[in-house]
Amino acid sequence: MGVETIYCPDEKNQIDLKKLMADLGNRGIDSILLEGGGTLNDSALRVGIVKEVQAFVAPKLFGGVAGKTPVEGIGVELPSEAVELRYTDICQIGEDIRIRCQV
């Protein structure tokens, strides 16, 4: 199985996610699993390439002012500015709960 690197920089020399998805679409790839940190998740949501979100909730509390968030960026001031999600599936997997939503 071969591997190919696709280089899709934007004007800031970061990954142009829309361009990357268009390139993958031209190759017959219509979906990917984007598993990243808060910065990548924020970028993908902002450019509109996210169609589904899956979140896992474990029976643990971490807390802390410097705790990581699944979506970094500047956030929103009002609930009406938030990205709207629609539940499609909630299930228990072992001790965890998986929440699947459409964007």
Where are these regions (language model features)?
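Enzymes that bind and transform nitrogen-containing heteroaromatic metabolites
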Residues: 1-103
